[in-house]
């Protein structure tokens, strides 16, 4: 059984930790492929380094690079995995571009969506898990955990508040695709809630 499940959330939502632990739980029942964006394949990882560790760049260039990395990732990893009946869990996907570049950068959600629709060629997630946490809590976690901060982490509070606003708009418009998980709880609680939600969805397939 194949399914494409993406994970989204603002910085400090615990997304990467949650997806890894949820994947371990799901592996007891399913053949799971865990991947991430930007990255996931060699070319995608090279673009990731430019995007997250490089110097400041034009907003539209940033959006185009994310879309290019996404296309390489789909063709090289996601699509083959789905065709082989895998359960694909992806750390970030198109909604990140819409929230970060489309809304927070001010390019426009519809403009960035058009770029990405060309890249994904109709391959939307079956469901998207959104880990909902406030900007204040997210930034506090990043500082507490002493996580290496990339170029996007270092944006100011207003930028990250806009990211959350952008996500909320996207979720409002596509509520049937999203499962919203309160992520201001302990990691164990968030992992369990996420695992239960995904399991319920998969049982219906």
Curated annotation (Swiss-Prot):
Any one GO CC term of the record: cytosol
Protein name, UniProt field: Thymidylate kinase
A molecular function (GO) term: ATP binding
Family, as annotated: Belongs to the thymidylate kinase family.
Lineage, uppermost ranks: Bacteria, Bacillati, Bacillota, Bacilli, Bacillales
Gene responsible for this protein: tmk
UniProt keyword annotations, A-Z: ATP-binding, Kinase, Nucleotide biosynthesis, Nucleotide-binding, Transferase
Function: Phosphorylation of dTMP to form dTDP in both de novo and salvage pathways of dTTP synthesis.
Broad EC category: transferase
PROSITE patterns named in the record: THYMIDYLATE_KINASE
Catalytic activity: dTMP + ATP = dTDP + ADP
Pfam families: Thymidylate_kin (PF02223)
GO biological process: dTDP biosynthetic process; dTTP biosynthetic process; dUDP biosynthetic process
EC number from the UniProt entry: 2.7.4.9
Residues involved in ATP binding: 9-16
Keyword Nucleotide-binding assigned: yes
């Amino acid at each position: 059984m194949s399914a494409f499940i993406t994970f989204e959330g603002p910085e400090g939502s615990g997304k990467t930790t949650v997806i890894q632990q949820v994947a371990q739980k799901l592996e007891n029942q399913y053949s799971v492929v865990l991947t991430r964006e930007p990255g996931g394949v060699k070319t995608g990882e090279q673009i990731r380094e430019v995007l997250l560790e490089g110097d400041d760049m034009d907003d539209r260039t940033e959006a185009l690079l994310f879309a290019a990395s996404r296309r390489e990732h789909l063709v090289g990893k996601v699509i083959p995995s789905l065709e082989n009946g895998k359960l694909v869990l992806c750390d970030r996907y198109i909604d990140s571009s819409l929230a970060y570049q489309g809304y927070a950068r001010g390019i426009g959600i519809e403009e960035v969506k058009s770029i990405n629709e060309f890249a994904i060629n109709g391959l939307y997630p079956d469901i998207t898990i959104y880990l909902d946490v406030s900007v204040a809590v997210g930034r506090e976690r990043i500082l507490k955990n002493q996580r290496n901060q990339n170029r996007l982490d270092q944006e100011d509070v207003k930028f990250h508040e806009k990211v959350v606003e952008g996500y909320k708009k996207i979720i409002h418009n596509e509520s049937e695709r999203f499962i919203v998980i309160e992520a201001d709880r302990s990691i164990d609680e968030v992992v369990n809630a996420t695992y239960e939600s995904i399991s319920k969805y998969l049982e219906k397939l």
